[in-house]
Amino acid sequence: MQKTNKFLKIGTKEFKSRLLVGTGKYSSLEVMQKSLINTKCEIVTVAVRRVQGLEHGHKGLMESIDWKRIWMLPNTAGCSNAEEAIRIAKLGRELAKLAGQENNNFVKLEVIPDKKYLLPDPIGTLKAAEQLVKEGFTVLPYINSDPLIAKQLEEIGCATVMPLGSPIGSAQGIRNAANIAMIIAESRIPIIIDAGIGVPSEAAQALEMGADGVLINSAIALAENPILMAQAFSKATEAGRDGYLSGRLKENPLASPSSPLEGVISNN
């Protein structure tokens, strides 16, 4: 965990913003573009399969983002096993090259056989991550909030781990804060909370806990005003990080007056 680092460092890259943003579910490319600007993000994740298949909402996506300013994070969304994820990761690397990022080996690794709750497969994720690390990828795996899996992925060479706050798109917030706190405490790599965050205050909570960043998509894209919500998440992420660095007031079972009692005028 990068406790007091000024920048978010993933692999050999450093980023000022700790807010990563997804590109799906926006009502239009124009709304997405304006939202991305308001987030001040420097990393944007792109679903390789959907972009290549030109699915609804993804046609023209690659051309609508300034890849000289934004670092692409290809993801393996839609992959249900390790082999499929490895293949899509390689396509993602080529996609980044087409965008002019020749040295981009980043991949957001998702192995999700469960179509109902979209929970990641830990065994498939470990298998794919191990192979991708060997092939020179900077691997950012999406995982359940399991400290043991997180540590195993760190030990095989992943650049971060990305535990879910709650299921993808559920807007349930950070449901397993205790486990995530364990992951943060035991990790020597950055921790990015991914999935389930629904409002800016939950992003602030994640950073206050000591997470190094958050990845947000649905909460911005599906808001009534995505462009304004993007700005709110940007501010919340910065506030949460500042709050963490400031050192919070310790909880106390007793009250503590904010004004000193010495010198108080008595009734006598």
Swiss-Prot record:
Keyword line: Cytoplasm, Schiff base, Thiamine biosynthesis, Transferase
- Name listed for the protein in its UniProt record: Thiazole synthase
What Gene Ontology biological process does one annotation of this record name? thiamine diphosphate biosynthetic process
What does the record give as the active site? 108
**One Pfam entry name:** ThiG
The chemistry this enzyme catalyses reads: [ThiS sulfur-carrier protein]-C-terminal-Gly-aminoethanethioate + 2-iminoacetate + 1-deoxy-D-xylulose 5-phosphate = [ThiS sulfur-carrier protein]-C-terminal Gly-Gly + 2-[(2R,5Z)-2-carboxy-4-methylthiazol-5(2H)-ylidene]ethyl phosphate + 2 H2O + H(+)
Q: Pull one GO CC term from this UniProt entry.
A: cytoplasm
The UniProt subunit note reads as follows: Homotetramer. Forms heterodimers with either ThiH or ThiS.
Q: What class of enzyme is it?
A: transferase
Where is it located? Cytoplasm
- The protein's organism comes out as Prochlorococcus marinus (strain NATL1A)
- Stated EC number for the protein is 2.8.1.10
- Primary location recorded for the protein, binned into one broad class: cytoplasm
Q: Which gene encodes it?
A: thiG
Coiled-coil-forming residues are none
